[in-house]
């Protein structure tokens, strides 16, 4: 007879701690924060993936702050507006006026990769590039917050009352591109973002192999199910770390022309097929392969593809059915009846598979309908895709249970598109928040908008539910504009250009970089020196002799207004 096993107390304690943590996670998930979130895994799965050392992250506090900010905007029909920040200077200036910060993958790719090798937005930079930029900015935010506290606590109450308080700790939302590979790559990327300070992350539904900037051509989508896997992987990692990082699901389905696979039935309605029966057995890929075997290349191969596509009569299956019904030898009333029946059975919310759609078509009298989605596949094996707002809506329906915001990338600032997308997604997910890219890739002056329309665009689409809106590359463009115009003027007019265009404008607009030593924290670190040395230091950076004393006063030059002429005064003092 086998001896009974006596469970050691250590094992019981271990299981007790595990079960307690499982209950805590479940209670967390049941909170208002996650009432719209669907998870295909359990709290036990999450706790099993955690270590025994509990950790906390500053980014989690920022994530909670971001969530509150966005939900407040959603309730008020307003929007958090921001733009891509390049560096600590920009992020501290933005803090005075905006309530969130964006970190753009495009800007990082062009200006700040971890290999220092710049390039276009193809997500081919090392995957720690954007997390490192987040850390760069998050450290700066925390530093300027500490610096401000030291400065304010050195003031009297009256001085503090007169001095505006700046909340430097504005939540950062970062560009996660496509997740940078498979599930484990996405998990590790999201871990980095949390550790480096991101309050939110967006992930898009393009193929990671062929990823393009949202406003480039040649975009290839992944299946709906694959992108859901990315979102689930991100959420799982956030859960494992115990953080409430805001997750944004982006879709590029409006302008995409290709899709990796036809494995997901939710994509079937938008895949194109050849409808010309004369091409039966003559796939585009085979035609191109034959051309290459014959020694053709470049323009010759492009001509083969162009000619093939010109005669293929590419259509979605639904378009093919509707055209076939219109050409049937039946009465107009019967045509209308069959078209209505087709539309009722094949509406986008039903997400019919192609097999199901063919069965319905056959019931409508279309037994020998020719439509082949394999014939037009590219040399890489991609299927042709009919990008549209409706395709983005269908993806929004699928992504919403796994994300906090949905973002539809567009090719122009179009109110009609925005309205259709918002109403479409919210018809199934009325509480979901939406995001919008106020892209500098749009030629806004060519959009047909008046200046008034441009001014009102943000609040107008905010009322539709777009509660987070951002100019991805405004930091980049602002940096380029200021540098180019100043360099040109400086080359022509020397120091007068600097004084007129930079120094005086900093003073006139109250920009705190005018006193750049103070901005960089010289006073703050003097406090360290003096604290270590008993309250006095002969080597304090801001002691007697620092040139920044010149900026504590302004002088009025006759006829020039209160612009300051300390430059002349400095020269006079130097000659004394």
Swiss-Prot record:
The keyword rRNA processing is annotated on this UniProt entry: no
Catalytic residues in the record: 213
Motif interval(s): Microbody targeting signal: 574-576
GO BP, sorted A to Z: glyoxylate cycle; tricarboxylic acid cycle
Top-level enzyme category: lyase
Domain of life from the UniProt record: Eukaryota
Subcellular location per the Swiss-Prot or TrEMBL entry: Glyoxysome
Biological pathway: Carbohydrate metabolism; glyoxylate cycle; (S)-malate from isocitrate: step 1/2
SUPFAM superfamilies listed in its UniProt record: Phosphoenolpyruvate/pyruvate domain
Entry GO terms, CC: glyoxysome
Keywords (A to Z) from UniProt: Glyoxylate bypass, Glyoxysome, Lyase, Magnesium, Metal-binding, Peroxisome, Tricarboxylic acid cycle
Binding site for Mg(2+): 175
GO molecular function: isocitrate lyase activity; metal ion binding
Recorded catalytic activity of this chain's protein: D-threo-isocitrate = glyoxylate + succinate
Residues the entry annotates as binding substrate: 104-106, 214-215, 250, 437-441, 472
Pfam assignment, any one: ICL
Gene3D superfamilies named in the record: 1.10.10.850, Phosphoenolpyruvate-binding domains
Main location: other
Similarity annotation: Belongs to the isocitrate lyase/PEP mutase superfamily. Isocitrate lyase family.
PANTHER family to which the protein is assigned, alphabetical: BIFUNCTIONAL GLYOXYLATE CYCLE PROTEIN, ISOCITRATE LYASE/MALATE SYNTHASE
Stated role: Involved in storage lipid mobilization during the growth of higher plant seedling.
Subunit field text: Homotetramer.
Protein name stated in the entry: Isocitrate lyase
Organism: Gossypium hirsutum (Upland cotton)
